[in-house]
């Protein structure tokens, strides 16, 4: 246990050390300031603008949102076409056939929405072309879209009396060129150096030591996809077992760098936010709130898995190792589970369905908080900004003052947008789960009975409704109902809050700043951090406690029988 504590502490310190300079760098990218890569990348940037016919004229929220939706729609159609027609496309050495309509629809929606929910196993269903040209490209652009929208939201708070919030195409291109591509290249090379597969060769057939039986070894351009799947909080694995598979995550060292990659950009964006609003204490307050909840979650999962519960008393000395890789152990698996669900990533290095009831409760609850404990790249922070505004609004009601945040007054229109930001994911999750448990096809998809069976369904629709993508593996996801309903949920959960954030940004950008007074609520002290954590947890608890009581909480109490 002492080793696990030291490992987790080292991870947090290293994460912060890496995130601070990256956050400063991303701030310069956001405002268009020259960075050390400018000499190399500026000509590429200018050529790209000319090639796409992009002007640098600012956009209103409506035009920005239309650009995001149109771009995502084109990506959706392209990915769906690639998946259904992959049997006729190149780079298909294993002769993979096209996916069914419902599965292709679900997968396209999943990757366009930055969810990466997978109702298939990559090595058994997709060609190299589909993986690299279809899905990997979407991993880049969906992540870049989230960060671009965050840039627009931040401009809303730092600009005054403006009718625009930036240019989507410029933001998208700069994020991809200056942030995602360089980081992904570095990480991909690092992964390849550690033994992660990167090849376009045919699958290998080897003779095993047992009776000379033949075994097919899947290969593929995995490292390049894994790099952006982690950095972009996408999470979709090249192989079905995701980061539990040795070809994706071969050692404890690669496990460390993949966990760092999952949280690096979300944490760095908080640093960038503090820089952008010219008050680093604002960023530190948000970081502290996120980190407190994250650390509590890591501790809860680790204790639950290490001490396992009454069934294992006096039996297991190394904790519950069911569904875990020996090379990662309880500590590496618990930290990964917390990171991937706190950051809206969804990659897994252990089977979450095999976690203890309380160990599985924490990742589920992280998602149900709205993926704002770091959250997805871009989307996590603008979601947290929605909770900050809600906290300021509640505090203003308590003292009878007009609420303000960063010098901008909070008005009824702003609160309407905040409600869309905060309430759409839980509504989709609960409605989807309620409908699903009544469907015979979903009931047949559940491998467990009782409370754990309900937990499998709740986890699946929580994951899709909050754009995470991880799953309890006992849930068989490839059914027409789950594919179609899940796809609609993922698209709505992604784009309704996104559009609401843009309209919130424009309304804020049109306001002038008001001077802080002695009665202004400070949003950078310990009291506000406590209020913010309370509001985030309370909204999640009020929304999901009844469902959690029927699932993982009831599952926990069955272990005492």
UniProtKB/Swiss-Prot annotation:
Q: Which domain of life is it from?
A: Bacteria
- Where is it located? Cell membrane
Residue ranges crossing the lipid bilayer per the database entry? 4-24, 65-85, 133-153, 177-197, 253-273, 285-305, 380-400, 417-437, 484-504, 528-548
GO cellular component terms given for this protein: plasma membrane
Coiled-coil blocks: none
Known partners and oligomeric status:
The system is composed of three essential subunits: KdpA, KdpB and KdpC.
Instruction: Output this protein's name.
Output: Potassium-transporting ATPase potassium-binding subunit
MF terms from GO for this chain are: P-type potassium transmembrane transporter activity; potassium ion binding
Record the organism.
Answer: Listeria monocytogenes serotype 4b (strain F2365)
Main subcellular localization, coarse class? membrane
Which NCBIfam families does this UniProt record tie to the protein? Answer: kdpA
């Amino acid at each position: 246990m002492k080793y696990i504590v030291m490992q987790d502490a080292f991870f947090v310190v290293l994460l912060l050390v890496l995130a601070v300079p990256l956050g400063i760098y991303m701030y310069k990218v956001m405002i268009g300031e020259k960075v050390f890569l400018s000499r190399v990348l500026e000509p590429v940037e200018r050529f790209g603008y000319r090639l796409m016919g992009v002007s640098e004229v600012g956009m209103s929220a409506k035009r920005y949102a239309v650009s995001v939706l149109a771009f995502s729609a084109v990506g959706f159609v392209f990915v769906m076409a690639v998946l259904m027609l992959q049997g006729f496309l190149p780079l298909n050495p294993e002769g993979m056939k096209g996916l069914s309509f419902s599965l292709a629809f679900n997968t396209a929606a999943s990757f366009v929405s930055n969810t990466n929910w997978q109702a298939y196993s990559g090595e058994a269903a997709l060609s190299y072309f589909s993986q690299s040209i279809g899905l990997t490209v979407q991993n880049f652009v969906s992540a870049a879209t989230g960060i671009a929208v965050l840039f627009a939201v931040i401009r809303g708070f730092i600009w005054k009396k403006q009718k625009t919030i930036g240019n989507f195409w410029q933001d998208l291109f700069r994020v991809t060129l200056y942030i995602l591509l360089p980081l992904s290249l570095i990480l991909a090379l690092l992964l390849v150096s550690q033994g992660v597969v990167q090849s376009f060769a045919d699958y290998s057939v080897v003779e095993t030591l047992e009776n000379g039986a033949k075994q097919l070894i899947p290969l593929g351009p995995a490292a390049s996809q894994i790099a952006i799947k982690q950095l972009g909080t996408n999470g979709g694995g090249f192989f079905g077992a995701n980061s539990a598979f040795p070809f994706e995550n071969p050692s404890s060292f690669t496990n460390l760098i993949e966990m760092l990659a999952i949280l690096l950009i979300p944490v760095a964006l908080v640093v960038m936010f503090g820089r952008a609003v010219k008050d680093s204490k604002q960023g530190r307050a948000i970081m502290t709130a996120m980190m407190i909840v994250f650390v509590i979650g890591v501790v809860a999962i680790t204790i639950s898995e290490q001490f396992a519960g009454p069934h294992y008393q006096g039996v297991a000395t190394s904790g519950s190792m069911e569904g875990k890789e020996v090379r990662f152990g309880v500590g590496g698996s618990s930290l990964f589970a917390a990171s991937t669900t706190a950051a809206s990533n969804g990659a897994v290095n252990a089977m979450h369905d095999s976690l203890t009831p309380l160990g599985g409760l924490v990742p589920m609850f992280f998602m149900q908080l709205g993926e704002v404990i770091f959250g997805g790249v871009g989307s996590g922070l603008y979601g947290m900004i929605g909770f900050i505004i809600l906290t300021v609004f509640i505090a203003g009601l308590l003292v009878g003052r007009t609420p303000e945040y960063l010098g901008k007054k909070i008005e009824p229109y702003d609160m309407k947008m905040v409600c869309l930001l905060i309430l759409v994911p839980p509504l989709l999750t609960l409605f989807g789960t309620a409908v699903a448990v009544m469907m015979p096809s979903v009931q047949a998809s559940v491998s467990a009975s009782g409370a754990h069976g309900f937990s499998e369904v709740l986890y699946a629709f929580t994951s899709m409704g909050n754009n995470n993508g991880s799953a309890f593996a006992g849930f068989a996801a490839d059914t027409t109902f789950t594919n179609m309903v899940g796809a609609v949920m993922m698209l709505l959960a992604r784009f309704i809050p996104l559009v609401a954030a843009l309209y919130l940004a424009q309304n804020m950008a049109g306001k002038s700043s008001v001077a802080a007074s002695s009665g202004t609520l400070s949003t950078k002290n310990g009291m506000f951090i406590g209020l913010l954590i309370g509001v985030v947890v309370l909204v999640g608890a009020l929304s999901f406690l009844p469902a959690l009581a029927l699932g993982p909480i009831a599952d926990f109490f069955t272990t005492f029988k």
